[in-house]
């Protein structure tokens, strides 16, 4: 695994991905069409300063992803600078959308390879980055749910029906990946299953590649997880990242005059459940599951037009603006790589 070819998608693939994004956006607009006048009116209440503040909070998400990436990669490359960690986060954000949900790790692995980290360890470290993110999502939602369960059960019992599925998916991913990383018996089982793949052509190449990735994943996980202070710092960064992300709906309620008496921590709970439940729903390039979960959670507390307005505010700041910034970040990161 020593490819240094750029992961930049072809023009055709880029246009296809952007077309899918535009189609999904069009579907959302079509669904909201009966309330579009109210949504537009609510968004028009935002001042320039409020809009810029919301964008800044939304952009904190990929920037903190970059800090986490920096902390993780420094376990193998001690002189890896913070700016390159942020560049790596832009790679992941841009790749996730352009790759329709499957491009994050390949883009980041390629970037780290160009910065001196072999592909195998790069895949291992970025997989562990994903584990830390999922763990933070699980912990954040669980702590707030334990504190606020009586309140949400009294006001929105429908959401609670989806929590077992969300816990099964998120906890299953975490336990499965940690077991694959740390338990020799699971690693042996995975190797045994891989040997059932066809022994010819591209399947043979894939099997060898996956076996190599499995070995490096085991090595990198043992190395990183043994550094307890570093792991605590990484998890802490992810928790701060989620806290700031979940501030956006509270800001939207205040800025657009949609306040319904929800406290700051109640909004934090509702938004954490939105992200948590979305993990149990299918999505394309990060769209679909969040929108569905958001309306499911907030519909018990806001009228339809208000919940849709808040959703548009939230996604404009946390998804569309972030993707646009990642396109710029991706281009600048490639330029810096080409300059050496």
Feature annotation, model-predicted:
Residues 1-41, 92-203, 283, 287-340:
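Transmembrane helix-loop-helix hairpins in multi-pass inner-membrane proteins
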Residues 192-225:
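Membrane-interface interhelical connector segments
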Residues 64-91, 252-270:
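Membrane-embedded helical hairpins/re-entrant loop segments and their flanking transmembrane helices
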Residues 13-16, 45-54, 222-236:
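Membrane-interface helix starts
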Residues 221-274, 281:
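Transmembrane helical segments that form the transport core of multi-pass membrane transport proteins
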Residues 38-45, 112, 213-226:
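A short amphipathic helical element positioned immediately N-terminal to and/or at the very start
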